[in-house]
UniProtKB/Swiss-Prot annotation:
It is an enzyme of class 2 (transferase). Geranylgeranyl pyrophosphate synthase; part of the gene cluster that mediates the biosynthesis of pleuromutilin, a tricyclic diterpene showing antibacterial properties. The geranylgeranyl diphosphate (GGPP) synthase ple4 catalyzes the first step in pleuromutilin biosynthesis. GGPP is then substrate of the premutilin synthase (PS) ple3 to yield premutilin. The record marks 137 as: Important for determining product chain length. Its EC number is 2.5.1.-, 2.5.1.1, 2.5.1.29, 2.5.1.10. This is Geranylgeranyl pyrophosphate synthase. Dimethylallyl diphosphate binds at residues 114, 200-201, 236, 243, 263. Belongs to the FPP/GGPP synthase family. Mg(2+) 1 binds at residues 105, 109. It comes from Rhodocybe pseudopiperita (Clitopilus pseudopiperitus). InterPro entries: Isoprenoid_synthase_dom_sf (IPR008949), Polyprenyl_synt (IPR000092), Polyprenyl_synt_CS (IPR033749). Binds 2 Mg(2+) ions per subunit.
Length: 350
């Protein structure tokens, strides 16, 4: 069963007898072929999807491999004990959503590269790339609704759709305020920045956990949302740090691209607060591509102790995570073994 679609229901009724009746029972994504065309042309839908989703397919191929999100969902399932097909369904939804969001993010950030290759909008154009990303947002919603219907009926499907909508709203609020800060050249406070990370980066992992826990069976009493949220925050703070410091990151995205994109990241905000007259604000407002200017900005952040402060914050989030994991596992160390191995690989060496 699929989400009822008023427009398709209307077309179906008009195509059959030219009248309008109540909308119900629409179970197909495929458009109704009417007005002299027969249903044998349904294959055109698949052909069109292949064309209009080329930017999405490009990123799915570019980013292929067992992602951290896939591994993490299985680590969480050690606490929940849910069927494998359910976990795979949720994981696919999160992966598709993540890749779709990257299509939009790279446009909004004006990024030229993604993992050392041209960003999708540089290859396919802004219009098609944006449409592909938005389309996948809705196909993911359809997929999780279908997964819920197959597993637990309308109640589970509706709960999953509600959670998805709720978290997508938060994700867009987080992305939106980050863009506003960037475009208005209005740096937020550190607390405002961390809240944005909770909405944006942490929200995607929290969505995955909440969808997993919609299953009617398993140990759904485990409170894993707080762990997922902090992992997301750690990811972004780590990204803030390595964007400025890691050579391998530079090869994939370009040197200190956060500076060129005009973003405000944690080390930048810490430095601006510590030394408002250091000249960093003026450099950041230029959104420079010039390597010398970017190196000067990084040198200022080093002088204000902001890169050390970033590492210290990463350490604090790490300690917080360790406490939360221990709280959820109790004495069952085997339950959290996979998650703890995952986290050890994620953490920056002290």
């Amino acid at each position: 069963m699929r989400i009822p679609n008023i427009f398709l229901s209307y077309l179906r009724q008009v195509a059959v007898d030219g009248t309008l009746s109540s909308c119900s029972g629409v179970k197909s994504r495929k458009p109704v072929i009417a007005f002299g065309f027969d249903d044998s042309q349904d294959s055109l839908v698949d052909e069109n999807d292949e064309k209009i989703l080329e930017p999405f397919g490009y990123y799915r191929h570019l980013l292929k491999g067992k992602s951290a999100r896939t591994v993490l969902m299985h680590c969480f399932n050690a606490f929940l004990g849910l069927p494998e097909d359910w976990v795979l369904g949720v994981t696919k939804a999160i992966e598709d959503l993540h890749n779709a969001s990257l299509l939009i993010d790279d446009i909004e950030d004006e990024s030229a590269l993604r993992r050392g290759s041209p960003a999708a909008h540089m290859k396919y154009g802004i219009a098609l790339t944006m449409n592909a990303g938005n389309l996948v947002y809705f196909t993911v919603l359809q997929d999780i609704y279908d997964l819920g219907m197959r597993t637990g009926g309308t109640q589970v499907a509706n709960a999953m759709a509600h959670i998805y909508t709720e978290e997508m709203i938060e994700l867009h609020r987080g992305q939106g305020i980050e863009i506003w800060w960037r475009d208005q050249r209005s740096p937020p406070s550190v607390d405002q920045y961390i809240h944005m990370l909770e909405q944006k980066t942490g929200g995607l992992l929290r969505l995955g956990v909440r969808l997993l826990q919609c299953h009617p069976g398993g140990n759904n009493r485990a409170d894993l949302s707080a762990i997922a949220l902090r992992i997301g925050v750690y990811y972004q703070l780590r990204d803030d740090y390595i964007n400025l410091m890691s050579t391998s990151y530079h090869d994939e995205r370009g040197f200190a691209e956060d500076i060129t994109e005009g973003k405000y990241t944690f080390p930048m905000l810490h430095s601006l607060k510590r030394s408002p007259d250091s000249g960093l604000r003026e450099i950041l407002d230029l959104k420079p591509a010039d390597i010398a200017l970017k190196k000067k900005a990084i040198a200022i952040m080093q002088e204000t102790g902001s890169l050390i402060a970033t590492r210290n914050l990463l350490g604090a989030v790490k300690n917080d995570l360790s406490g939360l994991v221990a709280e959820q596992r109790g004495d069952d160390y085997a339950m959290s073994a996979g998650l703890e191995r995952f986290l050890e690989k994620l953490y920056i060496a002290e």
